[in-house]
């Protein structure tokens, strides 16, 4: 079924007003989009940032009178409408379109991330079946790729791994499939823990090999390998805690770090770890090292 799509160019200050007004005049969905490919990194706590130049897309039933809807919108907001357009678009199978764009990916020499609905390109490889589900972590982001490639290059046989900020569970599950004895996952988001649990089951990982915790419930036990793909700010503030969770001689991999933040994060760990050269990809970095 076709839809009427209305696009408006707004400022962040106008976002809430126009979202409410569009729903009031009959929009069935409202979506915010970046108008200038401007990234948002590490917002302040308790904020929901928008881009400096934002496009607001609203979908209406196809038989909606666009002129009347826009006139009503102007009345509700009490101001002249910003730059806008309206067009009828054909319906799409959005889920199928998204699934078609998520293809198997290889990381390092052994490891493949394979969508759960896709056949493994190399059945004899280490294939991690993944449904991105409710949380981040599919391998498409440079930070996830950097961590997966690092794990693929490690001898993990018999190791205990801690995935701090586990998201979809992709790093912990990869470690288990690559030979780790056990992986512990922790995340502040209960939905992330649920996604990790689902993805572990999809890969036939027994629950006792992949226990999951909220941070406040995480047992204090040292790991042979710790991976944390989160953000630079938390990595710096959590440095003493994360260092204490790695045994002497254990290995560390950190990412979620912008290139310009790399030296600051590395400095926070330099007293506890012998650090490797920083790895860089597409403006993001990975920091690795061994516990003294």
From Swiss-Prot:
Keywords: Cytoplasm, Methyltransferase, S-adenosyl-L-methionine, Transferase
Binding site for S-adenosyl-L-methionine: 144, 165, 187, 229
Record InterPro entries: Ribosomal_L11_MeTrfase_PrmA, Ribosomal_PrmA_MeTrfase, SAM-dependent_MTases_sf
EC numbers on record: 2.1.1.-
Annotated compartments: Cytoplasm
A GO CC term attached to the entry: cytosol
UniProt GO MF annotations: protein-lysine N-methyltransferase activity
GO terms, biological process: methylation
One Pfam match: PrmA
Enzymatic reactions: L-lysyl-[protein] + 3 S-adenosyl-L-methionine = N(6),N(6),N(6)-trimethyl-L-lysyl-[protein] + 3 S-adenosyl-L-homocysteine + 3 H(+)
The organism's place on the tree of life at top rank: Bacteria
CDD domains membership: AdoMet_MTases (cd02440)
Entry-linked PANTHER family: ELECTRON TRANSFER FLAVOPROTEIN BETA SUBUNIT LYSINE METHYLTRANSFERASE
Family: Belongs to the methyltransferase superfamily. PrmA family.
Function description: Methylates ribosomal protein L11.
Name this protein carries in UniProt: Ribosomal protein L11 methyltransferase
Naturally occurring in which organism (per UniProt): Pseudomonas savastanoi pv. phaseolicola (strain 1448A / Race 6) (Pseudomonas syringae pv. phaseolicola (strain 1448A / Race 6))
